[in-house]
Amino acid sequence: MKWEDRLDIGGLSDVGMRRSNNQDSFRILAAPNVEQWRSRGHLFVVADGMGAHAVGELASKMAVDSIAHSYHKLVQLPIPQAIVKAVQDANSLIHNRGTANIEFQGMGTTSTALLLLPEGAMIAHVGDSRAYRVREGRVEQLSFDHSLAWELVRRKQLTLEQARTMVPTNVITRSLGPEG
């Protein structure tokens, strides 16, 4: 990708038909100039909160805000280490908030961050918020869920078809917050 290439950016989150509140959050931080893009890239972060009502909403908002803030402050680190550290910082922040107040106990969120860089893309991923690439009319899943079903398939203990029918699909094995 060249700086002159067109990049259309947008974001939308919808509560859907089954829930009364939306626990999704996202941040889009496009580099303001070519120098910033070459040095740190464009950052896209999504999160899907877990926990009762406002607790999940708060966790997802904390995740996207913290990851974006930390990543751009960690300019002394190489990009791969900076995005990992930013996710770790978000995890600690959410965990500390969850343990400091009984009402926030167990708060957590899934999150996926994508860095779009001159040399390609990089993904940091926790949970079941997926990253996809759409190219030439094809959709390709780039991340795989940290869920019980996917873990069993990855370990070859179940086929994909068995996992879809035998294992609850909403049991995630990794998230930001609950375990620090």
Region spans (language model):
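PP2C/PPM-type serine/threonine phosphatase catalytic domain
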Residues: M1-G180
